Amino acid sequence: MNPFHDLEPGPEVPEVVYALIEIPKGSRNKYELDKKTGLIKLDRVLYSPFHYPVDYGIIPQTWYDDDDPFDIMVIMREPTYPGVLIEARPIGLFKMIDSGDKDYKVLAVPVEDPYFNDWKDISDVPKAFLDEIAHFFQRYKELQGKEIIVEGWENAEKAKQEILRAIELYKEKFKK
């Protein structure tokens, strides 16, 4: 089984999507799902002394403008592991440009954690935490000499629109 191609994007798209975790919160290791084999591989260790502030992964059967699966960040109270599948509720969209390419990311919360039951939109997330995420992405490739431009945050509705678009891009790319 290849989770990227064989899993659906989610049980109730776009309200609830699957987040296939590649990188757990707190890690400096950047793992990626190998799109061909479906295995998790070590892409690199971050050059900067930063740690991912969220669980980070992809939404299965999606494709995005950066020529990769659509990224998703899941706010977790405790980190999970590479390969874990989380039912996640999109609450916002992080907009950034990575080396000239549009590289937007969905921000979500786990459906199965009652702590986040009232988190429905980006406005429910503390500004200090949003700033921490933005700071991480603004700086995490700095020692590699790569430029990241943070464009800011959008609401849950915009995130859901982009998820639906990413599903269509996947269908076009992989003729599904």
From Swiss-Prot:
Catalytic activity, EC: 3.6.1.1
State its role. Catalyzes the hydrolysis of inorganic pyrophosphate (PPi) forming two phosphate ions.
* Family statement: Belongs to the PPase family.
Please tell me where Mg(2+) 2 binds in this chain: 71
User: What SUPFAM superfamilies does this protein's entry cite?
Assistant: Inorganic pyrophosphatase (SSF50324)
Q: Name one GO biological process term.
A: phosphate-containing compound metabolic process
- Record: residues binding substrate: 30, 44, 56, 140
Concerning Pfam families, the annotation shows: Pyrophosphatase
Annotated coiled-coil positions are: none
Q: How does it assemble?
A: Homohexamer.
Required cofactor names: Mg(2+)
The entry's protein name is Inorganic pyrophosphatase
**GO molecular function annotations of the record:** inorganic diphosphate phosphatase activity; magnesium ion binding
